[in-house]
């Protein structure tokens, strides 16, 4: 009898610990709230007008980044939309550059910038995320 109680107790403890761990994992699943239609429209207009001050960087942006990052239908984070970039920036610039280099979700490998260096990608990410 004592052995049966001990087994139930271990099983119950296992379920409790599993439930707590699972609950903790669910708490980590968080998405940024979707912007209102008006906010999304403002972000799209802003993204379409922004351009790096540095002419070389501006040429790289125009050639390789603008088509997706200034187009809301592309589902890429819009240039200048800090809220859209916030969760990505939390991953750190090295990981974001790795996503550019290797491709990630809709991002093509190399970001379609075959002449860009890692420093260029760092600068383009900094520009687009501010």
Per-segment meaning from a language model:
Residues 1-27:
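Sec-dependent bacterial lipoprotein signal peptides
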Residues 22-24, 60-63:
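Disulfide-bonded cysteine motifs in exported proteins
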Residues 29-32:
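Bacterial signal peptide processing site
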Residues 35-59, 75-86:
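Electrostatic cytochrome c docking/interface patches
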Residues 56, 60, 84, 95, ...:
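Extracytoplasmic/secreted proteins, especially bacterial periplasmic and envelope-associated proteins
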Residues 61-71, 124, 128:
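The canonical Cys-X-X-Cys-His
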Residues 70-98:
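Gly/Gly-Pro-rich "capping" loops immediately C-terminal to redox-active cysteine motifs
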Residues 78, 99-128:
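Axial heme c-ligation environment in periplasmic c-type cytochrome domains
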């Amino acid at each position: 009898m004592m052995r049966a109680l001990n087994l139930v107790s271990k099983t119950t403890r296992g379920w409790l610990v599993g439930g707590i761990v699972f609950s903790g994992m669910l708490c980590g699943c968080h998405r940024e709230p979707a912007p209102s239609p008006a906010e999304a429209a403002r972000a799209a207009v802003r993204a379409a007008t922004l351009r790096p001050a540095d002419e070389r960087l501006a040429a790289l942006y125009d050639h390789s980044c603008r088509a997706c990052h200034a187009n809301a239908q592309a589902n890429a984070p819009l240039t200048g939309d800090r809220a859209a970039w916030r969760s990505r920036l939390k991953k750190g610039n090295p990981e974001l550059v790795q996503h550019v280099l290797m491709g990630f979700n809709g991002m093509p490998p190399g970001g379609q910038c075959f002449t860009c260096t890692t420093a260029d990608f760092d600068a383009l990410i900094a520009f687009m995320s501010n």
